[in-house]
């Protein structure tokens, strides 16, 4: 059972959003999103029922166990993407994807909380001009919320990538400065720290996928969540640094010169043993 906070009952906007949560949640159907349970009783106070999900949040896992294995992270990311697609199919954005809102149960991830969900059409009619600050958590919300730019599915992608980065590193990609950034100038000077700096076991191509999904400019992120997931699973040549590529690709001339030198040396050694003795 979820009930509204007593401290916020005097806030009409909060009460309105709370009432909307049940309706929003009832529209979403996915094994990776917490389910709204229909109440058969006549209600005498404000509440709604949700599925009981046993398990630990991703934040619990990180705080108690540190970084998580890449294979598990990819599996959980797959689950979260399936959950987010359920929102996106209903023209909704979750807007508050963060480690505390993802529960792990039997090795699978489930998205919880509907308090910040944006529903196309509905929000435009009910949202006041004063309600410009994002309802989600600043540390994980995409820059466009604070810059008052259009929010899209790529906004959820950014938040998801923040969570994936934290699962793999127990850190955040832009440091403490990200949460404090509120304008274009502040966002423009942010420095992305590669995931493998914090965790050397992270492949460079996985970091490349994270870096793309975490672009401050939403236009530079992935077109779809499936592309992001694919690049987490399989190496994308675009993200392989020159140093990681074979010598024949980096410098064909040097490769063939080196190979020729090896062959010549091999021939000389053979001749020495045949005629030098």
What feature does the model see in each segment?
Residues 139-239:
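C-terminal lobe helix-coil module of Hanks-type protein kinase domains
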Residues 43-57:
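Conserved short submotifs of the Hanks-type protein kinase catalytic core
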Residues 82-92:
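Protein kinase catalytic-loop region centered on the HRD/HxD motif
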Residues 2-7:
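Conserved beta3-strand ATP-binding lysine motif
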Residues 58-68:
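AlphaC helix of the protein kinase catalytic domain
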Residues 39:
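Activation-segment/catalytic-loop signature of the eukaryotic protein kinase fold
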Residues 8-27:
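AlphaC helix of the eukaryotic protein kinase fold
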Residues 76-77:
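Activation segment signature within eukaryotic-like protein kinase domains
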């Amino acid at each position: 059972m979820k009930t509204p906070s007593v401290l916020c009952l005097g806030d009409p906007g909060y009460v309105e959003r709370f009432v909307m949560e049940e309706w929003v949640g009832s529209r979403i159907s996915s094994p990776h999103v917490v389910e709204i349970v229909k109440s058969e009783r006549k209600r005498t106070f404000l509440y709604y029922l949700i599925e009981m999900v046993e398990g630990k949040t991703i934040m619990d896992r990180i705080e108690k166990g540190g970084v998580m294995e890449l294979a598990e992270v990819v599996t959980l990311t797959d689950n979260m993407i399936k959950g987010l697609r359920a929102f996106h199919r209903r023209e909704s954005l979750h807007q508050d994807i963060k480690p505390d809102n993802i529960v792990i149960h039997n090795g699978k991830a489930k998205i919880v909380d509907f308090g910040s969900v944006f529903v196309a059409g509905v929000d435009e009619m009910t949202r006041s001009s004063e309600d410009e600050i994002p309802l989600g958590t600043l540390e994980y919300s995409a820059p466009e919320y604070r810059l008052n730019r259009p929010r899209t599915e790529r906004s959820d992608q950014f938040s998801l990538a923040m969570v994936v980065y934290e699962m793999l590193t127990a850190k955040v990609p832009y440091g403490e400065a990200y949460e404090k950034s509120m304008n274009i100038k502040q966002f423009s000077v942010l420095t992305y720290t590669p995931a493998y700096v914090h965790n050397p076991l992270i492949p460079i191509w996985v970091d490349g996928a994270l870096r793309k999904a975490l672009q401050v400019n939403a236009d530079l992120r992935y077109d779809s969540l499936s592309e992001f997931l694919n690049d987490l699973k399989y190496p994308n040549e675009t993200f392989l640094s020159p140093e990681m590529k074979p010598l024949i690709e980096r410098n064909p001339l040097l490769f063939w010169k080196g190979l020729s030198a090896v062959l010549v040396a091999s021939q000389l050694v053979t001749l020495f043993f045949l005629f030098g003795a």
